């Protein structure tokens, strides 16, 4: 396929994705810009995959981390890691080349995995908010109310519901037959936008905001209770005081993770709703920026843990040293020096 850049122009639709009628126009970027974007995306994918892989390994390996909250963190990290491993490479090519070159089967599979991992993330953050709410607001009953078995049920729901939900829309024709007037065919050959239509724009909005409202309301209550506990903490014994402080620290850290998630995903979610009302007028470049800003969230959580959790930093130090080969390392106490 020939692509020609006009002299003095940075980029322009100078070619088509395929040499067929109805092909999508292809925006050709200068080689230097393409290489720069590929390198930036590669670094982002590396941080996403390795950072979340370490979370998965640390929680799995160190027995002291086998708690309900950490199992939820492990499952969340697994979703983010798989996003970086299976979704982002093809998304990078699509964004840089402005075309989908991988066929209809991979288009549908890529869309399925993309939606699955993103919905799984928000479900897990919602469940983690419930866990922190129980730990802070009802600390005496928390160990019996939120057990490992309960956490595993939440994890199963966090994966199962998004998997069934996304498969229903992508691999059945029920919605297509019932709401054909709302749905549009693929705008052109070489595009992979199966779920970007008016119906999905309206459906995506509550799927994002209902869990977000739940998380915000829970963390507001956590903040009120934690403030009250801070005034009472001096009267507690030293051991109980330390336990309460650890729970509050975890709630604060995970609250930051939820806040960053909202900031990263809000532009994309609002745009999908508004764009469906305005007949999809968002420029492709702006839409790609919103998508990648949302993807960026998957790399954030391990970075948050590094700066917030002593156990995470200690586990990282052990992983990068020879001590990881010692059988005693698996039972190491990561919470004390």
From Swiss-Prot:
<dbReference type="GO" id="GO:0007189">
    <property type="term" value="P:adenylate cyclase-activating G protein-coupled receptor signaling pathway"/>
</dbReference>
<dbReference type="GO" id="GO:0007166">
    <property type="term" value="P:cell surface receptor signaling pathway"/>
</dbReference>
<keyword id="KW-1133">Transmembrane helix</keyword>
<keyword id="KW-1015">Disulfide bond</keyword>
<feature type="transmembrane region" description="Helical; Name=2">
    <location>
        <begin position="71"/>
        <end position="91"/>
    </location>
</feature>
<feature type="topological domain" description="Extracellular">
    <location>
        <begin position="275"/>
        <end position="284"/>
    </location>
</feature>
<feature type="region of interest" description="Extracellular Loop 2 (ECL2)">
    <location>
        <begin position="176"/>
        <end position="189"/>
    </location>
</feature>
<keyword id="KW-1003">Cell membrane</keyword>
<feature type="topological domain" description="Extracellular">
    <location>
        <begin position="1"/>
        <end position="38"/>
    </location>
</feature>
<keyword id="KW-0807">Transducer</keyword>
<comment type="similarity">
    <text>Belongs to the G-protein coupled receptor 1 family.</text>
</comment>
<feature type="topological domain" description="Cytoplasmic">
    <location>
        <begin position="131"/>
        <end position="154"/>
    </location>
</feature>
<feature type="disulfide bond">
    <location>
        <begin position="24"/>
        <end position="188"/>
    </location>
</feature>
<feature type="transmembrane region" description="Helical; Name=6">
    <location>
        <begin position="254"/>
        <end position="274"/>
    </location>
</feature>
<dbReference type="GO" id="GO:0005886">
    <property type="term" value="C:plasma membrane"/>
</dbReference>
<feature type="transmembrane region" description="Helical; Name=1">
    <location>
        <begin position="39"/>
        <end position="59"/>
    </location>
</feature>
<keyword id="KW-0812">Transmembrane</keyword>
<dbReference type="Pfam" id="PF00001">
    <property type="entry name" value="7tm_1"/>
</dbReference>
<feature type="glycosylation site" description="N-linked (GlcNAc...) asparagine">
    <location>
        <position position="21"/>
    </location>
</feature>
<keyword id="KW-0472">Membrane</keyword>
<protein>
    <recommendedName>
        <fullName>Trace amine-associated receptor 5</fullName>
    </recommendedName>
</protein>
<dbReference type="GO" id="GO:0007606">
    <property type="term" value="P:sensory perception of chemical stimulus"/>
</dbReference>
<keyword id="KW-0297">G-protein coupled receptor</keyword>
<feature type="transmembrane region" description="Helical; Name=5">
    <location>
        <begin position="205"/>
        <end position="225"/>
    </location>
</feature>
<dbReference type="InterPro" id="IPR017452">
    <property type="entry name" value="GPCR_Rhodpsn_7TM"/>
</dbReference>
<dbReference type="InterPro" id="IPR017981">
    <property type="entry name" value="GPCR_2-like_7TM"/>
</dbReference>
<dbReference type="GO" id="GO:0007186">
    <property type="term" value="P:G protein-coupled receptor signaling pathway"/>
</dbReference>
<keyword id="KW-0675">Receptor</keyword>
<feature type="topological domain" description="Extracellular">
    <location>
        <begin position="92"/>
        <end position="109"/>
    </location>
</feature>
<keyword id="KW-0325">Glycoprotein</keyword>
<feature type="topological domain" description="Cytoplasmic">
    <location>
        <begin position="226"/>
        <end position="253"/>
    </location>
</feature>
<feature type="transmembrane region" description="Helical; Name=7">
    <location>
        <begin position="285"/>
        <end position="307"/>
    </location>
</feature>
<dbReference type="InterPro" id="IPR000276">
    <property type="entry name" value="GPCR_Rhodpsn"/>
</dbReference>
<feature type="disulfide bond">
    <location>
        <begin position="99"/>
        <end position="192"/>
    </location>
</feature>
<comment type="function">
    <text>Olfactory receptor specific for trimethylamine, a trace amine enriched in the urine of male rats, playing a role in social behavior. Also activated by N-methylpiperidine. Trimethylamine is present at high concentration in the urine of male after puberty and acts as an attractant. Trimethylamine-binding causes a conformation change that triggers signaling via G(s)-class of G alpha proteins (GNAL or GNAS). Also required to provide olfactory input into limbic brain areas to regulate emotional behaviors likely via modulation of the serotonin system.</text>
</comment>
<feature type="transmembrane region" description="Helical; Name=3">
    <location>
        <begin position="110"/>
        <end position="130"/>
    </location>
</feature>
<dbReference type="GO" id="GO:1990081">
    <property type="term" value="F:trimethylamine receptor activity"/>
</dbReference>
<dbReference type="InterPro" id="IPR009132">
    <property type="entry name" value="TAAR_fam"/>
</dbReference>
<feature type="transmembrane region" description="Helical; Name=4">
    <location>
        <begin position="155"/>
        <end position="175"/>
    </location>
</feature>
<dbReference type="InterPro" id="IPR050569">
    <property type="entry name" value="TAAR"/>
</dbReference>
<dbReference type="GO" id="GO:0001594">
    <property type="term" value="F:trace-amine receptor activity"/>
</dbReference>
<feature type="topological domain" description="Cytoplasmic">
    <location>
        <begin position="308"/>
        <end position="337"/>
    </location>
</feature>
């Amino acid at each position: 396929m020939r692509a020609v850049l006009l002299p003095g122009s940075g980029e322009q639709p100078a070619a088509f994705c395929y040499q067929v009628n109805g092909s999508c126009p292809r925006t050709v970027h200068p080689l230097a810009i393409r290489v720069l974007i590929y390198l930036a995306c590669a670094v982002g994918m590396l941080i996403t995959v390795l950072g979340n892989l370490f979370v998965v390994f640390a929680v799995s390996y160190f027995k002291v981390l086998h708690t309900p909250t950490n199992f939820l963190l492990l499952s969340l990290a697994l979703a983010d890691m798989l996003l970086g491993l299976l979704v982002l490479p093809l998304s990078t090519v699509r964004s840089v080349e402005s075309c989908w070159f991988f066929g209809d089967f991979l288009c549908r599979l890529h869309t399925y995995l993309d939606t699955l991992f993103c919905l799984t993330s928000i479900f897990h953050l919602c469940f983690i908010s419930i866990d922190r709410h129980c730990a802070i607001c009802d600390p005496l009953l928390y160990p019996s109310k939120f057990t490992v078995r309960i956490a595993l049920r939440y994890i199963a729901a966090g994966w199962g519901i998004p998997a069934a939900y996304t498969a229903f829309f992508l691999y059945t024709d029920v919605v297509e037959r019932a709401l054909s007037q709302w749905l549009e065919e693929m705008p052109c050959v070489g595009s992979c936008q199966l779920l970007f239509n008016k119906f999905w724009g309206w459906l995506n909005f509550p799927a994002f905001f209902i869990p977000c409202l739940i998380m915000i309301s829970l963390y507001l209550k956590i903040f009120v209770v934690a403030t009250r506990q801070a005034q009472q903490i001096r009267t507690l014994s030293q051991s109980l005081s330390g336990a309460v402080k650890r729970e509050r620290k975890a709630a604060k850290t995970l609250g930051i993770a939820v806040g960053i998630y909202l900031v990263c995903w809000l532009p994309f979610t609002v745009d999908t709703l508004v764009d469906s009302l305005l007949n999809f007028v968002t420029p492709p470049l702006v839409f790609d920026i919103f998508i990648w800003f949302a993807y960026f969230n998957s790399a954030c959580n391990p970075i948050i843990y590094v700066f917030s959790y002593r156990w995470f930093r200690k586990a990282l130090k052990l992983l990068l040293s020879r001590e990881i080969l010692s059988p005693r390392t698996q039972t190491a106490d990561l919470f004390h020096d």
